[in-house]
């Protein structure tokens, strides 16, 4: 799951303990978000920043529910077509699990053969929520434990 650190960083999540992940406005990313269940782990990726990369691990605290920001006119994520009865967007609650000693950079991730087919690394991939296979998960955990 990707977030811009000035919106929500791994350190913000650590301080808060739990936060709402909202503002997903792409149907494919929304569907990935909706498929996540309480207790599942995810990699927290810092995007659109000087050092993009995987910064830590979070846990899904509660299954998806209608995203309230879609109904808030002052929100950057407001959707004029959404209503309380028909809100196509979802939010999810997340919890902090761990931060890595350093961000696992996009360049480092791209250099790993085991991650070559990872959705995040595919050309044109801009989704904020993407699946990670069990093999990819293990490869990234190994990188994080090496202190890269």
Can you name each region flagged by the protein language model?
Residues 1-38, 136-137, 144-148:
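Compositionally biased, charged N-terminal/linker segments
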Residues 9-11, 51-54, 66-69:
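Short acidic/glycine-rich loop or secondary-structure boundary segments that cap or lie
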Residues 56-123, 127:
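Aromatic- and Lys/Arg-enriched surface recognition patch
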Residues 12-13, 70, 105-107, 140-143:
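A short secondary-structure junction signal
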